[in-house]
């Protein structure tokens, strides 16, 4: 990932950061956005670089060895089935025009089932962290990164 490369560039060493830790928060953010857009948000797979930055700032990060994000019988990530359930739950909340406490339990149970339970604390290289404290220990400031977009209808 880009941030792992940044850590190398900064002289922080090699890290294997958990992509799925960020993906879980990405889906939670998409569900919120979809609800506020009356069902017109994007609940699909994939994202943009600011999605990673936002999730990192919200919940932190963990090493891959702490959160693999595969909690089912597969060696590779396959979110097709999970995304169908995400869409079903997200669209049901929109149709009902409310999100009950049970809705949030269902969403978190869905992610726990497919991605695994989130660690509140973990030990990495002999030191105890929370996802937020681990993120802080990396020294990555998301405000140091900007996104650029090139479009065909504007000159370079």
Name each model-derived stretch.
Residues 3-156:
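Catalytic-core signature of thiol
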